[in-house]
Amino acid sequence: MHTIVVGLNYKTAPVEIREKLSFIESELPQAMEALQKQKSILENVIVSTCNRTEIYAVVDQLHTGRHFVKQFLADWFDLPVETFSSYLTIREEDEAVEHLFKVTAGIDSMVLGETQILGQVKKSFLSGQEIGTTGTVYNQLFKQAVTFAKRAHNETAIGENAVSVSYAAVELAKKIFGSLQRKHVAILGAGKMGELAIENLYGSGVGKVTVINRTFEKAESLAAKFHGQAKSMKELQCSLLEADILITSTGATDYVIDYELMQFVERLRKGKPLFMVDIAVPRDIDPRVGDLPNVFLYDIDDLQGIVEANLAERERAAADITDMIGHEVIQFKDWVSTLGVVPVISALRKKANRIQEETMTSIENKMPDLTERERKILSKHTKSIINQLLKEPILQAKEMANSPKANEQLRLFQQIFGIEEAVEAEVQEMTKQELERKERAQATQTSAEPKYSF
């Protein structure tokens, strides 16, 4: 049994390759079911977003597992393997486990520390659970990874502070005004940067939105998205008097708001603070405006400096999380190592319980006059003796499972307790149950062959 991750992401493949290997979200369950039918695949979860497509799989052999995952991708997307193989990254064993923890924690994302990927991984995992493509190993691993990601975000600053210019503008506005509730934000320019800024401010609860643009129709279109009002450039001075926050992003080659205009506006505002963000290049606002009282002016370089400082904070947090992941990988490996000892412990317990039951039967035959209460007392104490005797051997068996010579030591353990045949029966029963689980999962599918997405 081996764990692998086969996939590509924004680091390894350009968007024109990523879009060819991107699963439609509604077809992910169908894709995982189709992959589960492939040779060598024991469990699988597929994670597919705009920035990554990754197949997490438990396989019986590494070489065949890699081969059949690649072939599955080729068949599903109707692409020759050689057209995308060079963009794939393959991770195995500890590296594969570590990668999942990094992805869920957001430290492998384009936006360091983002949490959207955690929800996407969780959704794929829950889908795999529902349709039966996950089993003992991935049920444990993905639950551990999701739990860890939440803890990492709670215990570090990985998700704090803005790492985009538009978010930095919101962060600054909150520092100046505290709450943005009932604040009036005006946007000068109806381009993409202005839209991003207003989107983030609107999401933070601003009360009123005004869009000012040379082309009134564009102003109307953008304002409608945020239940705001549109104004022409002729109404700029009035908007400066009314707004609490102004964000400028025009394509003008000279200052749209000069020092003299703002001197006049500032006097009429009578000390009311105005937060101004100039994200235009060239700048829309005369930098001397920042010298006026109660005017807080920031340009693109100021915001970029904040973003870089915040990103450095997140990178330090990411380093801390990477250290934490090392402990998580060890913890998962320790858990996996106990899987081999499960049938041994189960067989030992069953033998001990059988001896206890046979002993009770013998006692009852020789002492037929025992009351029900006496039988219960004897049963309770004989079971207690059995449990106390088993405690140390079970602990030893678990330690053996972590030993480099685990197979030899566990074989000797089975011989000492005379449970070799019982262990083999336990292994066969567990294998049978796993096969039945897979058959039940496949039975829920339609009788038709999987529909591939072209």
From Swiss-Prot:
Keywords: NADP, Oxidoreductase, Porphyrin biosynthesis. Pfam families: GlutR_dimer (PF00745), GlutR_N (PF05201), Shikimate_DH (PF01488). Substrate binds at T49, C50, N51, R52, S109, E114, T115, Q116, Q120. InterPro entries: 4pyrrol_synth_GluRdtase, 4pyrrol_synth_GluRdtase_dimer, 4pyrrol_synth_GluRdtase_N, GluRdtase_CS, GluRdtase_dimer_dom_sf, GluRdtase_N_sf, NAD(P)-bd_dom_sf, Shikm_DH/Glu-tRNA_Rdtase. Residues 434-454 are annotated as: Disordered. The keyword Oxidoreductase applies. NADP(+) binds at G189, A190, G191, K192, M193, G194. The record marks H99 as: Important for activity. It comes from the Bacteria. Signal peptide: none annotated. One of its GO terms (biological process) is protoporphyrinogen IX biosynthetic process. The active site is at C50 (nucleophile). GO terms for molecular function: glutamyl-tRNA reductase activity; NADP binding. It catalyses: (S)-4-amino-5-oxopentanoate + tRNA(Glu) + NADP(+) = L-glutamyl-tRNA(Glu) + NADPH + H(+). During catalysis, the active site Cys acts as a nucleophile attacking the alpha-carbonyl group of tRNA-bound glutamate with the formation of a thioester intermediate between enzyme and glutamate, and the concomitant release of tRNA(Glu). The thioester intermediate is finally reduced by direct hydride transfer from NADPH, to form the product GSA. Possesses an unusual extended V-shaped dimeric structure with each monomer consisting of three distinct domains arranged along a curved 'spinal' alpha-helix. The N-terminal catalytic domain specifically recognizes the glutamate moiety of the substrate. The second domain is the NADPH-binding domain, and the third C-terminal domain is responsible for dimerization. NCBIfam families: hemA, PRK00045.1-3. Catalyzes the NADPH-dependent reduction of glutamyl-tRNA(Glu) to glutamate 1-semialdehyde (GSA). Belongs to the glutamyl-tRNA reductase family. HAMAP family: Glu_tRNA_reductase. This is Glutamyl-tRNA reductase. It comes from Lysinibacillus sphaericus (strain C3-41).
